[in-house]
């Protein structure tokens, strides 16, 4: 998925929102 850079872990999703 789009969060594959961190295997879609919850923290990765949170960081992705911050870096958006």
Swiss-Prot record:
Key words of the record: Pathogenesis-related protein, Plant defense
Recorded superkingdom: Eukaryota
GO biological process, one term: defense response
Protein induction: By heavy metal ions.
Family indicated by similarity: Belongs to the BetVI family.
Name this protein carries in UniProt: Protein PR-L5
């Amino acid at each position: 998925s789009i969060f594959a850079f961190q295997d879609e872990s919850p923290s990765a999703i949170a960081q992705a929102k911050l870096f958006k």
